[in-house]
């Protein structure tokens, strides 16, 4: 879908660039596939702030998305494409041959009326799901499982995809958007195609209020605080903070590596931090 620009009739419209969602369904979601979503505002059960700069967002209902695609060899027709406030991608409502309704992530080039199916050996076309071991090398995929049967975890946000670049001893080699190359079991399911809404990265909110609608409150810089509030606080006049950037609790930030799961290091063939050649 294309981007939508606006005439500068007000200050908030001047810089505004949003995704044109005119092709999406304009009604309410399927009630049996939704549930209420409680807005915490960054507070815990004591009412204390545990996540700063959150709160005041628009009320949402959660849509149940089928990330597992366990209904094998039963074709489904795309009823409509919908907006989902809980994610950056669009979602598709599909109706199986037996009448069951389900939501899936909508890939690019999937239209209303198309047919999708999940199975061990199905056609390589957008929306179809199958094990990585049965896909041709070079295929573009999304919603990739990391453990068989767990449900898709990799490449689920707007415009995201991974590419199957090879196989090795029962494992599939994936190249991710970050540049990382990773081993995943060939039995893991993935869906063909790239995720919808690739223009999401080009939007411009135009005004602070749009961030507030999404629950984002003003993020105060450490150098603007007092010494009691932040390691960068205080000083006469404006200062640079005087040290490498840290969090309010003194932990290094802005580039400090935080990955500590050594058990899965063996599955990373090429780190996303390696210099691009």
UniProtKB/Swiss-Prot annotation:
One Pfam family named in its UniProt record: Ribosomal_L2_C
GO CC, alphabetical: large ribosomal subunit
Record carries keyword Endoplasmic reticulum: no
GO molecular function, one term: rRNA binding
Keywords, in A-Z order: Ribonucleoprotein, Ribosomal protein, RNA-binding, rRNA-binding
InterPro entries listed in its UniProt record: NA-bd_OB-fold, Rib_uL2_dom2, Ribosomal_uL2, Ribosomal_uL2_bac/org-type, Ribosomal_uL2_C, Ribosomal_uL2_CS, Ribosomal_uL2_dom3, Ribosomal_uL2_RNA-bd_dom
Disordered: region residues: 222-277
Keyword Ribosomal protein: yes
Domain of life: Bacteria
Classification via SMART domains: Ribosomal_L2, Ribosomal_L2_C
BP GO annotations: cytoplasmic translation
Membrane-crossing residue ranges in chain numbering: none
Disulfide bonds listed in the record: none
Family: Belongs to the universal ribosomal protein uL2 family.
Quaternary state and interactors: Part of the 50S ribosomal subunit. Forms a bridge to the 30S subunit in the 70S ribosome.
Function as written in the Swiss-Prot or TrEMBL entry: One of the primary rRNA binding proteins. Required for association of the 30S and 50S subunits to form the 70S ribosome, for tRNA binding and peptide bond formation. It has been suggested to have peptidyltransferase activity; this is somewhat controversial. Makes several contacts with the 16S rRNA in the 70S ribosome.
HAMAP family in alphabetical order: Ribosomal_uL2_B
Name of the featured protein: Large ribosomal subunit protein uL2
Organism annotation: Bartonella bacilliformis (strain ATCC 35685 / KC583 / Herrer 020/F12,63)
